[in-house]
């Protein structure tokens, strides 16, 4: 992952773990994480490993290899209380801000945008009713990932 060579292995791990954490954040916002939400989040991760932005394909390949294990670990070890879980995930994701600043501005923008579109895609799946995408009210406050500072597209 040549775009991440300025980062430590711990920082790269935090960036990678953000994907299953975002999936748990969105899927669990209503207090119930369904198998279909977990499966869809895993499928999204896999799709992004071969389709999408070229500079993030290798990143998603790394995540795809262990996504289900990480997702299940987070569900198992994070608090079962929804508010406590959401806060813990939010606090964890806020640690990405310092790491994203170390990246090339375009890569940071792509990664930030990718996190947000991933969150939206997970929400669409969890609220899919008769083929219509519906974002549940509990998910709405988390969709823009307010704990991660906005990154503008470089000029």
For the regions a language model picked out, list residue spans one by one.
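Small-residue-enriched hydrophobic alpha-helices in membranes
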Residues: 1-28, 32-155
